[in-house]
Protein backbone atom coordinates (compact mmCIF):
# COMPACT_ATOMS: atom_id res chain seq x y z
CA UNK A 1 0.00 0.00 0.00
CA UNK A 2 1.24 3.49 -0.82
CA UNK A 3 2.69 5.44 2.12
CA UNK A 4 0.64 8.55 1.34
CA UNK A 5 -2.53 6.48 1.46
CA UNK A 6 -1.48 4.97 4.81
CA UNK A 7 -0.86 8.46 6.19
CA UNK A 8 -4.31 9.56 5.02
CA UNK A 9 -5.88 6.51 6.65
CA UNK A 10 -4.05 7.25 9.91
CA UNK A 11 -5.14 10.89 9.80
CA UNK A 12 -8.73 9.82 9.09
CA UNK A 13 -8.70 7.33 11.97
CA UNK A 14 -7.26 9.95 14.31
CA UNK A 15 -9.93 12.45 13.25
CA UNK A 16 -12.64 9.86 13.92
CA UNK A 17 -11.19 9.26 17.41
CA UNK A 18 -11.61 12.97 18.09
CA UNK A 19 -15.02 13.19 16.43
CA UNK A 20 -16.30 10.23 18.47
CA UNK A 21 -14.95 11.75 21.69
CA UNK A 22 -12.34 9.08 22.39
CA UNK A 23 -9.52 11.63 22.39
CA UNK A 24 -9.05 15.25 23.35
CA UNK A 25 -6.43 17.92 22.70
CA UNK A 26 -4.08 16.42 25.29
CA UNK A 27 -3.30 13.58 22.89
CA UNK A 28 -2.14 16.11 20.27
CA UNK A 29 0.13 17.63 22.88
CA UNK A 30 1.63 14.20 23.57
CA UNK A 31 2.20 13.69 19.85
CA UNK A 32 3.75 17.15 19.58
CA UNK A 33 6.49 15.95 21.94
CA UNK A 34 7.72 13.51 19.29
CA UNK A 35 10.81 14.47 17.36
CA UNK A 36 13.47 12.87 15.20
CA UNK A 37 15.34 11.66 18.28
CA UNK A 38 12.24 9.91 19.63
CA UNK A 39 9.84 9.31 16.72
CA UNK A 40 7.77 6.73 18.62
CA UNK A 41 7.26 8.81 21.73
CA UNK A 42 3.45 8.92 21.58
CA UNK A 43 3.17 5.19 20.97
CA UNK A 44 5.51 4.50 23.89
CA UNK A 45 3.51 6.80 26.17
CA UNK A 46 0.25 5.13 25.11
CA UNK A 47 1.79 1.71 25.72
CA UNK A 48 2.82 2.77 29.22
CA UNK A 49 -0.66 4.20 29.80
CA UNK A 50 -2.28 0.86 28.98
CA UNK A 51 0.20 -1.07 31.11
CA UNK A 52 -0.40 1.24 34.08
CA UNK A 53 -4.15 1.64 33.62
CA UNK A 54 -4.65 -2.12 33.32
CA UNK A 55 -2.77 -2.56 36.61
CA UNK A 56 -4.87 0.16 38.27
CA UNK A 57 -8.09 -1.50 37.10
CA UNK A 58 -6.94 -4.89 38.41
CA UNK A 59 -6.09 -3.29 41.76
CA UNK A 60 -9.49 -1.66 41.71
CA UNK A 61 -11.26 -4.98 41.10
CA UNK A 62 -9.37 -6.45 44.07
CA UNK A 63 -10.35 -3.47 46.22
CA UNK A 64 -14.02 -4.02 45.35
CA UNK A 65 -13.78 -7.65 46.46
CA UNK A 66 -11.77 -7.01 49.62
CA UNK A 67 -13.47 -3.77 50.65
CA UNK A 68 -17.12 -3.84 49.58
CA UNK A 69 -18.76 -0.44 49.72
CA UNK A 70 -15.54 1.31 50.76
CA UNK A 71 -16.39 4.24 48.53
CA UNK A 72 -13.43 6.35 49.65
CA UNK A 73 -10.99 3.60 48.65
CA UNK A 74 -12.81 3.04 45.36
CA UNK A 75 -12.75 6.76 44.64
CA UNK A 76 -8.99 6.90 45.24
CA UNK A 77 -8.37 4.14 42.69
CA UNK A 78 -10.65 5.78 40.14
CA UNK A 79 -9.02 9.18 40.68
CA UNK A 80 -5.68 7.59 39.80
CA UNK A 81 -7.11 6.14 36.59
CA UNK A 82 -8.83 9.42 35.72
CA UNK A 83 -5.53 11.28 36.11
CA UNK A 84 -3.79 8.86 33.77
CA UNK A 85 -6.58 9.27 31.22
CA UNK A 86 -6.38 13.06 31.45
CA UNK A 87 -2.63 13.08 30.87
CA UNK A 88 -2.90 10.99 27.70
CA UNK A 89 -6.07 12.52 26.26
CA UNK A 90 -8.33 9.47 26.73
CA UNK A 91 -11.48 11.55 26.98
CA UNK A 92 -14.27 8.94 26.99
CA UNK A 93 -12.54 6.78 29.60
CA UNK A 94 -11.86 9.89 31.69
CA UNK A 95 -15.50 10.96 31.47
CA UNK A 96 -16.67 7.54 32.62
CA UNK A 97 -14.20 7.74 35.53
CA UNK A 98 -15.90 11.01 36.49
CA UNK A 99 -19.31 9.29 36.39
CA UNK A 100 -17.96 6.53 38.60
CA UNK A 101 -16.62 9.04 41.11
CA UNK A 102 -20.02 10.74 41.19
CA UNK A 103 -21.61 7.39 42.08
CA UNK A 104 -18.99 6.99 44.83
CA UNK A 105 -19.96 10.38 46.21
CA UNK A 106 -23.57 9.19 46.31
CA UNK A 107 -22.45 5.87 47.87
CA UNK A 108 -24.30 4.11 45.07
CA UNK A 109 -22.65 0.67 44.79
CA UNK A 110 -24.87 -0.45 41.91
CA UNK A 111 -24.09 2.72 39.96
CA UNK A 112 -20.39 2.21 40.67
CA UNK A 113 -20.55 -1.35 39.37
CA UNK A 114 -22.33 -0.33 36.15
CA UNK A 115 -19.99 2.59 35.64
CA UNK A 116 -16.88 0.47 36.18
CA UNK A 117 -18.11 -1.95 33.50
CA UNK A 118 -18.38 1.05 31.16
CA UNK A 119 -14.87 2.18 32.12
CA UNK A 120 -13.52 -1.26 31.23
CA UNK A 121 -15.46 -1.33 27.95
CA UNK A 122 -14.31 2.16 26.90
CA UNK A 123 -10.73 1.27 27.88
CA UNK A 124 -10.81 -1.89 25.73
CA UNK A 125 -12.33 -0.09 22.73
CA UNK A 126 -9.77 2.71 22.97
CA UNK A 127 -6.92 0.19 23.18
CA UNK A 128 -8.09 -1.47 19.97
CA UNK A 129 -8.53 1.86 18.17
CA UNK A 130 -5.12 3.14 19.27
CA UNK A 131 -3.48 -0.14 18.22
CA UNK A 132 -4.97 0.30 14.74
CA UNK A 133 -3.84 3.93 14.60
CA UNK A 134 -0.25 3.20 15.62
CA UNK A 135 -0.08 0.21 13.28
CA UNK A 136 -0.98 2.51 10.37
CA UNK A 137 1.65 5.02 11.49
CA UNK A 138 4.32 2.31 11.69
CA UNK A 139 3.43 1.15 8.18
CA UNK A 140 3.44 4.72 6.85
CA UNK A 141 6.79 5.61 8.40
CA UNK A 142 7.89 8.61 10.49
CA UNK A 143 6.37 11.26 8.21
CA UNK A 144 2.91 9.97 9.13
CA UNK A 145 3.13 10.91 12.78
CA UNK A 146 2.71 14.67 12.78
CA UNK A 147 -0.81 15.23 11.49
CA UNK A 148 -3.24 17.14 13.67
CA UNK A 149 -6.95 16.70 12.94
CA UNK A 150 -8.62 19.70 11.34
CA UNK A 151 -10.02 22.09 13.93
CA UNK A 152 -8.02 20.60 16.81
Swiss-Prot record:
GO terms for biological process: cytokinin-activated signaling pathway; phosphorelay signal transduction system. Residues 38-140 form the HPt domain. GO terms for molecular function: histidine phosphotransfer kinase activity; protein histidine kinase binding. Disruption phenotype: Dwarf, narrow leaf, sterility and small grain phenotypes. Keywords: Cytokinin signaling pathway, Two-component regulatory system. One of its GO terms (cellular component) is cytoplasm. InterPro entries: AHP1-5/YPD1 (IPR045871), HPT_dom_sf (IPR036641), Sig_transdc_His_kin_Hpt_dom (IPR008207). It comes from the Eukaryota. Functions as a two-component phosphorelay mediator between cytokinin sensor histidine kinases and response regulators (B-type ARRs). Plays an important role in propagating cytokinin signal transduction. This is Pseudo histidine-containing phosphotransfer protein 5. It comes from Oryza sativa subsp. japonica. The gene is PHP5.
